[in-house]
Amino acid sequence: MKNVTDSFLSLGPWPSAGSFGFNTDIFATNPINLSVVLGVLIFFGKGVLSDLLDNRKQRILNTIRNSEELRGGAIEQLEKARARLRKIETEAEQFRVNGYSEIEREKLNLIQSTYKTLEQLENYKNETIRFEQQRALNQVRQRVFQQALQRALGTLNSCLNNELHLRTISANIGMLGTMKEITD
């Protein structure tokens, strides 16, 4: 406090103690007035200013604390969202893999059933070919047999006469008779 008083004394000439009045010299009174106002402000305003600064400091600290809490909550929500995202990505990957597996399985089943159908068609074709070959062979055999029979009949008819015919029948009847006697 002594420093403040000394600073007032050094500012300029003071009027004598016996006279009290107004100094109209603006340049002489301004520094004195300013120093008085500053002194009063410092003396009385120190507590108010200290309280204001403390309040401001507390508000800033509270704001920082609230911001830190909000930041912590945001980080926690972000981690939860990331975990949910990872879970969903994993499930999506599983669905994708399962979907591809299911598609591949269906594709293989379709290919296998197509091969089986083709194999059955090939078997039916081969059976039809064999059947047609057999039928053609039977027709050829029948035709050959008919032609051979017609030639044989033609040959027999041209070679046989009634007398030879009667002798052949008598010989066959004789053989049948002897066979009957043997069996009795």
Curated annotation (Swiss-Prot):
GO molecular function, one term: proton-transporting ATP synthase activity, rotational mechanism
Protein name per its UniProtKB record: ATP synthase subunit b, chloroplastic
Keyword list, A-Z: ATP synthesis, CF(0), Chloroplast, Hydrogen ion transport, Ion transport, Membrane, Plastid, Thylakoid, Transmembrane, Transmembrane helix, Transport
Record-stated family: Belongs to the ATPase B chain family.
Cell compartment(s), UniProt: Plastid, Chloroplast thylakoid membrane
Domain of life: Eukaryota
Job of this protein: F(1)F(0) ATP synthase produces ATP from ADP in the presence of a proton or sodium gradient. F-type ATPases consist of two structural domains, F(1) containing the extramembraneous catalytic core and F(0) containing the membrane proton channel, linked together by a central stalk and a peripheral stalk. During catalysis, ATP synthesis in the catalytic domain of F(1) is coupled via a rotary mechanism of the central stalk subunits to proton translocation. Component of the F(0) channel, it forms part of the peripheral stalk, linking F(1) to F(0).
Any further remark recorded for this protein: In plastids the F-type ATPase is also known as CF(1)CF(0).
Species per Swiss-Prot/TrEMBL record: Ipomoea purpurea (Common morning glory)
Chief location bin: plastid
Lineage of origin: Eukaryota, Viridiplantae, Streptophyta, Embryophyta, Tracheophyta
The keyword Thylakoid belongs to this UniProt entry's keyword annotation: yes
Membrane topology classification: Single-pass membrane protein
Assembly, per entry: F-type ATPases have 2 components, F(1) - the catalytic core - and F(0) - the membrane proton channel. F(1) has five subunits: alpha(3), beta(3), gamma(1), delta(1), epsilon(1). F(0) has four main subunits: a(1), b(1), b'(1) and c(10-14). The alpha and beta chains form an alternating ring which encloses part of the gamma chain. F(1) is attached to F(0) by a central stalk formed by the gamma and epsilon chains, while a peripheral stalk is formed by the delta, b and b' chains.
Sequence intervals crossing the membrane: 27-49
Stored InterPro entries: ATP_synth_b/b'su_bac/chlpt (IPR002146)
One of the record's GO cellular component terms: chloroplast thylakoid membrane
